[in-house]
Amino acid sequence: MQLKARLACQTASFALGLALALPASAGAADALLSGAVKSASGEAMGGVTVSAKAGTITTTVFSDAAGNYYFPPLPSGKYQIWAQALSFATAKNEVDLAASRRQDFTLAPITDYESQVRQLPGDLILAGLPEDTPDDRRLKQIVRNNCTSCHTPSYTLQHRFDETGWNAIIQTMKQINVYGIYRGGGEVNKVLDFHQGELAAYLARARGPNEGGAFKITTRERPTGEAARAVFTEYDVALNPDQRLPAPDHPIDGSDWSLGTPSRVGSLPHDAAPDLDGNLWFAAVVPNRTMSVGRIDAKTGAVKPFKIDAANGMAAVSHGLIRDDKGMIWFNAHISRGSLAKVDPKTEKVSVYIPPTGMSQIDGPVTLDFDGAGQIWAGTGDGVLRFDPAAERFSEYKSLTPKTAKGGVGMTYGVAGDRDGNVWWTQMAFDIVAKADIKTGKSEEWTLPPVVDQIKLANQNDIKFYEGYAPTDIGTPFPWSQGPRRIGIDRAAGVLWVANSWGGSLSRFDTATGNMSFVPLPDPATHQPYDATVDAGHNVWTPMWTTDQIAKYDPSTSRWTLFDLPTRGTEVRIASLLEQNGRKQVVMAFPRASKVAVMTVRSEADLAALKTQAARP
């Protein structure tokens, strides 16, 4: 029998700042803020990140080729405003839009070496590690795949330790699984265990007592063209009050790059999606007593918690969250049994659907999707579940290669429903992409080929070790693994896109024939895609969770566009789209920084109109 629970949402305010913090004079007339950015030597600086914050809302734009920047209309009031670019010190000021609507900046170059390193996003930190010898390149790949399964490289490598210190860190990290659970005395990450000594020596050579060492600071071009026309609106989500964290005088939340990549302690959001009214919903992934999911009012920044009760007064936490084509918000809920939940944004009614005994529960790194028939799909440890919203009934489809094979870590990661009602999923640890045909009831699977260049780097000792190796969790891959993570369907074109997190590529599947090809990311060695989402124009959006960027791929031109995110250490997992009235919003959660963000891209005409308005006296 299907068990269904209906739960009322929690309406109590969330302590420690989840309640509304309004920008000053939020009801006053909107104002235009603009200015120019130049270097200390007087040169105009294009592509500089310029942010303005009031209350819990931060708006970010980028300067154009002439060094000028133009914000969209902002509520009149007082703002903190800052400008930053890699290798330059952050410039800060305050502006009252009731009195002034222009703020110019002069950026001075950073002269302190460690301050330059601290600014870097994860891909540039990784790029700076030595690769002068085959052994260097071999160890660099092990760092990339096995030291970044739960955090960006910049979180650890912004610091320096001697060989003893790096040994102690690796000793600890090899006992923590991908979910952040310490397994002291239990099973360890065998890859880190095997390579521990040489990894510690390698890291100490790069980020050790000697300033600079073998580490090479690299930067990247600042945004131009379409990427420089992006506008970000970020909403702060207060840290988990259960952890009783002290309020710092200068919070490190990734907003000021000079302070480095933040700690993730207390951050709640994981996935995020907009409802049809433009408000933002996010899954709360960290154990807490207040919320399972939260809703952000996009106009005010107010956060409202919705709680599903679990044991001992805790909230049933979530991981995956989507909006279906009817506007309903679906998410998984970890209660006594991994379940599916829905909230109607209009009525705020929450419903919970528990899989019947005998079926797999919805657990693991859960991803959700819906298909062309409106059925909801969710990942399990053994495959996928389909939920029929009309009949309120579950069906199960299991992986051909069971999760117990090859070390027992073959649970489902990505899930996508195609236009014909079929489902596709990935087993990340096994490099498998699977499909269930609903009409025939048959399943099939594809094993992705290894990353050949990485196999060539392995020495004889490595080869001998890996011959008997089986991953201990999804975060302990072979150095040559592809790591198919989350996936997305272009239902109109009949194309599945797979984000290969370790392989630095997208896989393209024809959903009718199963034919597959690869599309490499612009820099496969450092770019790690997490998800793939397709817009109405067939563009593929993939968050690169260690680079603080989101990439757009246009299959018609084979062109990539990289959009810089305004926060350092975002660890963005998924992009959700809202396409209405000719306007596209790209919604992302920043799990490490405890924010939810909306990106829009202005047209050249939009920007020209703002320039004209700003020039008026």
Give the location of each predicted region.
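Blade-level signature of beta-propeller repeat domains, shared across WD40, Kelch, NHL, RCC1
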Residues: P566, T570-P617
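A short, solvent-exposed loop/turn motif at the edges and junctions
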Residues: G55-T56, K78, W82-E94
